[in-house]
């Protein structure tokens, strides 16, 4: 049906389907500043202004917007240098988001700026609480909101016509930079009416002047106040991200996921799905090569087992892949998924990491193509094993006056980047497979995908635009092969973008761990021995299993070595088993295994100090590794200088 939309003062005649969202239509018109974050308006990445009020474009049908004035980030401002065309430049809100460093990944920035614009038009002199309330509908995974709040306070002062103290390195002072001399001390800006009472309410100052050292004077950027180089385009909502891309003949991919935690596909019938008009391809494990690989974006050789397949006959978690579909529209692809008929042999799942290695436990990886790494043993559901002994732990415990033992549990956590996993694949004019993807590891992706796709490296090119947050979740090869297989099958461009629900069951998370600590202590608070055992649940696949869990002990257990003779000769033990279960796979996450060690260790140290009536900080400092001392695990693992 035909509808008319008024967007940023321009009239658009659009041909839509009744179920088309306003988000879909705006992006099809090239308004890429409107982002997809989820289907329910929770992230607020799809925030626009309708008749001056913030709304979620993803929650509105296009037909509902007819007769209303729509404003997107593209209407606010533009680069001040537009050739011969006069330009008013960036909007004050865009400028201050750049100047204050409020932009990190930038995926949420258009929504935040639009929400702030509505607030300042309604309340020119807002309180910090009012600003936080206005921004609360646009989730930001990166900044913690301190800088966006500072930016809006500063913009409010500028828009009221009040003078504001310059921020060195801001867009207003480029070029050149205005910096202090060596003789001047750094000056921190006090709270003022220019930007609200920031220091007293957020316990942070606006921005310090930067003192450039003599070493920094000879350098172009290091030691000098430099704004984020790509902040201007992010503040304008320019097409900087993977899905901000147009190409003719684009197909849309969807994945059929397993509803069983552990099962074997006995039969799969795709005839009805293939016959559906608009379906270009349906792929199952019967249609593509069976190549074992690891999804971990790590250096070669990958320090972990090869235990993944693009598509497999065995399902190992709820959400595992059953089939891929490519169709002319996302709606047709979704309908095709419903037409695929699958018969399963349901197997007993392993859902408790403590039971995974018990005799007789169901074996999750019994495929002959499995490739071991180090001490992995798939028949025992063991993805990795770590055994590190430093000194003589038994002797250390024998010399202790007290022994403290406790068990802790660290839960599974999802990265929750606002931009979901998304990829576009197509053949270029040189018959190279172009993979445009939201990844943290473009070169690892290229290397890992080559054998999976049956292509030499030179025939694959990976393009990494800006990513809308990753936090380790995109250090994994999770979606690239889906679109690539479908492009190979159809010879057409393919877009695959995960739903927010898929992010939680088919993506990755922090490794949940059960951690047992045993510590020997003398009456004066000296540690004599420290022992950690970690049982790590890697889920259905072992990507990052060894390296993440290795960090758990490597970083935490080296922090407190003991005092006196124990300082030079600590007694430390770190053992870990990383087990397969039928949970969704774990993977890389910011901190990379370290929080799973530090959190229980610090709880444990606090408990010991309390029991011995010692000052918790003094107790820690007495036993802590000090500057200049050798890291005991680095010695054990032959890392660093001798």
Task: List PLM regions with ranges.
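Alpha-helical support elements that line or immediately flank enzyme active sites
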Residues: 112, 121, 255-286, 323-344, ...
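Flexible, low-hydrophobicity surface segments
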Residues: 159-378, 403
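Accessory "access/gating" subregions that flank catalytic or transport cores
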Residues: 393, 397-405, 409-414, 621-642
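Beta-strand segments within the central parallel beta-sheet cores of soluble alpha/beta enzyme folds
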Residues: 38-41, 129-136, 285, 458-465, ...
């Amino acid at each position: 049906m035909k509808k008319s939309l008024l967007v940023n003062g321009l009239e658009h005649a659009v041909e839509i389907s009744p179920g088309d969202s306003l988000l879909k239509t705006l992006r099809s018109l090239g308004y890429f500043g409107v982002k997809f974050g989820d289907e329910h308006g929770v992230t607020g990445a799809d925030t626009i202004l309708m008749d001056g009020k913030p709304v979620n474009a993803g929650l509105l049908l296009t037909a509902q917007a007819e007769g209303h004035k729509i404003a997107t980030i593209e209407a606010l401002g533009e680069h001040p240098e537009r050739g011969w065309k006069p330009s008013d430049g960036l909007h004050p809100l865009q400028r201050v988001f750049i100047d204050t460093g409020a932009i990190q990944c930038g995926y949420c920035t258009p929504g935040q700026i639009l929400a702030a614009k509505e607030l300042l038009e309604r309340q020119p002199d807002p309180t910090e609480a009012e600003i936080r309330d206005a921004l609360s509908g646009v989730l930001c995974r990166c900044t913690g909101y301190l800088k966006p709040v500072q930016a809006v306070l500063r913009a409010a002062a500028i828009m009221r016509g009040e003078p504001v103290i310059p921020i060195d390195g801001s867009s207003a002072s480029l070029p050149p930079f205005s910096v202090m001399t060596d003789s001047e001390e750094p000056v921190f800006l006090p709270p003022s009416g220019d930007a609200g009472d920031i220091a007293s309410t957020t316990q942070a100052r606006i921005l310090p002047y930067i003192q450039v050292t003599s070493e920094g004077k000879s350098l172009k950027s290091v030691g000098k106040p430099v704004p984020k180089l790509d902040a201007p385009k992010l503040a304008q909502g320019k097409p900087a991200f993977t899905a901000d891309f147009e190409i003719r003949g684009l197909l849309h991919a969807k994945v059929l996921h397993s509803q069983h935690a552990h099962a074997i596909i006995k039969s799969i019938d795709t005839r009805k799905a293939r016959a559906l008009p608009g379906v270009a391809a349906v792929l199952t494990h019967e249609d593509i090569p069976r190549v074992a690989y690891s999804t971990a974006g790590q250096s070669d050789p990958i320090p972990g087992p090869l235990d993944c397949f693009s598509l497999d006959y065995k399902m190992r978690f709820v959400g595992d892949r059953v089939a891929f579909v490519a169709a002319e529209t996302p709606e047709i692809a979704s309908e095709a998924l419903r037409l695929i008929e699958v018969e399963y042999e349901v197997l007993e799942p392993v859902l408790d990491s403590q039971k995974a290695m018990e005799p007789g436990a169901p074996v999750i990886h019994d495929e002959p193509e499995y490739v071991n790494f180090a001490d992995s043993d798939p028949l025992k559901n063991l993805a990795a094993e770590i055994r590190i002994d430093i000194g003589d732990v038994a002797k250390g415990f024998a010399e202790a006056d007290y022994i403290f033992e406790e068990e802790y549990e660290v839960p599974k956590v999802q990265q929750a980047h606002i931009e979901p996993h998304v990829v576009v694949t197509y053949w270029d004019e040189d018959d190279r497979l172009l993979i445009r993807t939201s990844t943290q590891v473009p070169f690892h992706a290229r290397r890992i995908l080559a054998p999976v796709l049956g292509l030499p490296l030179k025939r694959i090119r990976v393009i990494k635009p800006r990513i809308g947050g990753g936090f380790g979740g995109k250090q994994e090869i999770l979606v690239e092969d889906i679109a690539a297989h479908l492009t190979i099958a159809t010879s057409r461009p393919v877009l695959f973008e995960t739903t927010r629900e898929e992010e939680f069951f088919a993506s990755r998370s922090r490794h949940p761990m059960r951690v047992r600590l045993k510590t020997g202590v003398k009456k004066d608070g000296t540690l004599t021995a420290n022992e950690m055992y970690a049982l790590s649940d890697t889920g259905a696949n072992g990507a990052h299993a060894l390296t993440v869990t290795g960090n758990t002990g490597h970083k935490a257990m080296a922090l407190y070595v003991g005092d006196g003779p124990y300082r030079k000769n600590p007694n430390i033990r770190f053992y870990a088993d990383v087990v397969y279960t039928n949970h969704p796979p774990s993977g890389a996450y910011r901190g990379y295994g370290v929080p799973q060690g530090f959190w229980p260790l610090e709880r444990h140290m606090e408990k010991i100090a309390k029991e011995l009536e010692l000052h918790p900080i003094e107790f820690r400092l007495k036993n802590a590794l000090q500057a200049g001392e050798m890291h005991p695990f680095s010695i054990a693992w032959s890392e660093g200088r001798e």
